[in-house]
């Protein structure tokens, strides 16, 4: 669960987020929408732990812990990642590499062994079946150069 309590944030003395309260329960899907400059990116960056923001007040509770007390690396290890909507395409690097690295970081933090490529792909298949995702979605995950952004949106 993610809960934001009375969060106020500023950048360079300019208030960006004022007294935000939000509760997202496990399994719930939420879209944060708003016009340019309304604080969507600021909120994402604050949750991920990006520097340059002043937290004037409030808490961000993730899995019963105030993550504002954690380094970005500790937040990532707890399962919080910030990924681009349109990731930079690097020839030869698939989205699956990013996802496997992220998962293995969490596994390491939890004292588990990392998954090799085969085990990771098997896990992806199990999860996609559990979620009822089309097999073409998983196939697109493995592409290295064709634009995967169409699937990620």
Go through each PLM region and give its residues.
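Q-loop/switch helix immediately C-terminal to the Walker
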Residues: 82, 86, 92-108, 120-123
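Helix-to-loop junction immediately C-terminal to a conserved catalytic motif
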Residues: 48
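ABC ATPase NBD Q-loop/coupling interface
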Residues: 59-75
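The feature captures the beta-strand-to-loop junction immediately N-terminal to the Walker
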Residues: 33-35
